[in-house]
Amino acid sequence: MAPTRKRAGCLLIGEIALNLNEINFSFGGLHCLRDFGCIYVENKGHAITPKIRRNEYDISGTPGTILMPGDLPETLEFDGTLFFIRDPPSQAAAQQQLRRIAAWLTNGRQRLIFDYEPLRYYMASVDDELNWGFSDWIDGGLDVTFTAQPYAYALDETTASATTSGTSAQINFVLTTGAPAPIRAEVLNTGTAPITGATLTAGGNAVQLSGMNIASGDALLIDMEPPIGAAFSDGENALPYAARFDYLTARHGPQSISATLAYGSGTKGAKITIKARGRF
């Protein structure tokens, strides 16, 4: 429903008053109200969960479909309209402001954070054309459709670490979000002996690398966020050293992630840090 009138601090939609700080958003670090003087009104509400694309097949002579593993969430759409909170002094000024807004919104995929959910963000982009219309508001409004990747991500990563002066360590990790989250791991050499091998295990899956030569102060970085990979702290690709490279995720709740290390000669020592960005 289109806005009908404004009062201090609130936008009135029918008989419902919404606080302005509850319906706006930031995109790519800029805020629609604070940086562009616009309020955002959702056109049809907003999606809570994405549509699921089932991995299913039709088989001749069999009723219905056969469901296979591998369901995938699809993208989300957030559809709304931006309205100027103060009328531009002229049509030329309005056009200049609209071009600033268009440049902001069409700058590729960025973090989209709604004010009513400040600790979560979507990775979103505006791919459709932007249209200015006069049907909903006497001074006009800019129709905007965000296409978002299927998860809302926690603004802050969950982090846990453990140190060892031997060949093994257990990292106690607690993820407070529902969906499994890809793990990022750092194995930092804090001793004098080079680290020649490392195995990380989480939930039955494992990453195993051998034949390395990680010197004191250097690190191995493993990242399960796409594009999945492993590298040393100097940027060298570590995947050629991998004997096993399963997909590691943290699940909801407390869990233990184990690390097993192999060394050359010298004093053993390492710090293992595990990170995961929760998703909803």
Question: Can you describe what each PLM-predicted range is?
Answer:
Residues 57-61, 65-89, 138-151, 255:
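Oligomerization/assembly interface segments of phage tail-like spikes and tubes
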Residues 44-48, 64-68, 124-135:
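Short amphipathic beta-strand and strand-loop transition segments with alternating hydrophobic
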Residues 72-76, 104-106, 136-140, 177-179, ...:
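Solvent-exposed loop and beta-edge segments used for protein-protein assembly and interaction
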Residues 33-38, 121-128, 207-213, 241-243:
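Short amphipathic beta-strand/extended segments with alternating polar/hydrophobic composition
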Residues 107, 111-152:
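Short beta-strand and beta-hairpin "edge-sheet" elements
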Residues 2-58:
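Polar/acidic, low-complexity leader/linker segments enriched in S/T/G and N/D
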Residues 74-118:
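Long, hydrophobic/aromatic-enriched structural stretches that serve as scaffold segments
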Residues 154-280:
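Intrinsically disordered, low-complexity segments enriched in serine, threonine, and glycine
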